[in-house]
Amino acid sequence: MTRCMSLVVVISTLATVGCASGTGALKPATPADASAPAVLWRDPGRIGALDLYWGAGAQSRAPRGPFSFVEEDTSGTNPKITVKDARGRTWDMKFDEEVHAEVAANRLVWALGYLVEDQYFVRSGTVTGAKELGRARKFVGANGAFKDARFRFRDPAAPRTEEEWTLQRNPFVGSKELSGLHILMTLINNWDIEGPRNNRVLRARVSGGRVERRFLVSDLGATFGKMGGGPISNHSKWVLDDFRKEKFIDKVEAGTLHLAHDGFDPDINRVPLAHARWFAGLASQLSSSQLRRAFEAAGAAPAEVDGYTAKLREKIAQLKAAVGS
């Protein structure tokens, strides 16, 4: 879908620069370019008309098997491998507890105007040539068969860069779009967004040969569970009962919405009421059927589709009531 407006900020200085580590990781491939416009959000248009099953992708662009093994990615906390599909496209495959959460979150983030990479849930398939695997061995059989994987497309037209950003250090500080992202991360209980580790900048070539810097939360796997606070043992991912119990909004006071965000980043729990009202206007356009499609795309069981949809509807209604919209 074409989005007609974007939040674009041009800055002359870079955020801190670093490199990803770990064999096979999605390594920064392109130097940062401070002269290119910075984009965090695009107007999604008629949100109520969006298809949250395919999201930013499309059925025609979905991964197509069989898949051939490239390498194992040892970065992060979840088992991952890199593969090529039948059309020669390169994909990052993730297994285990973040698979469903990441795809569902990807659909919601995209629908509300924030930038994402193409992701798909694949129920089963075969990877040829996968030998001597480490932690991915549990999820890829000796015959190459796998079940329940998240596929993320490595788009050569929008490679990741060395530029880093956090929710406190970025070109969008003070904007309603950044405030909306704070609310959105609390809405889906994303507790692992501290620092630049899960935030990336893509260098994308767009129409007319122009280049833009796309700022996105690149790992959405620590969602739809318990934020918990404190040590990581207090947190969970993709646990419906935990998601149902988490508090969303603390209070409204002196023109500020106080979020009950209890993740690794303690500084995103206060949002100007005007910004919160703007975001509530976006989120309230999502229908129950659209939310269901997002969870179906993530491979959720029927009870999970029902439960997550109902809780999100409840949280969005709570937001609307809190901001008076």
Task: Place the predicted regions along the sequence by residue.
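Bacterial N-terminal signal peptides that target proteins for export
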Residues: M1-V8
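N-terminal, Lys/Arg-enriched amphipathic/low-complexity engagement segments
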Residues: G22-F67
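Conserved ATP-binding subdomain of kinase catalytic cores across diverse folds
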Residues: A56-E164
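Extracytoplasmic/secreted envelope proteins and their assembly/folding machinery
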Residues: K80, E102, N106, L181-L184, ...
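Conserved kinase catalytic-core segment
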Residues: A101-E102, R107, R160-H235
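C-terminal catalytic region of ATP-dependent kinase domains
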Residues: S207-S325
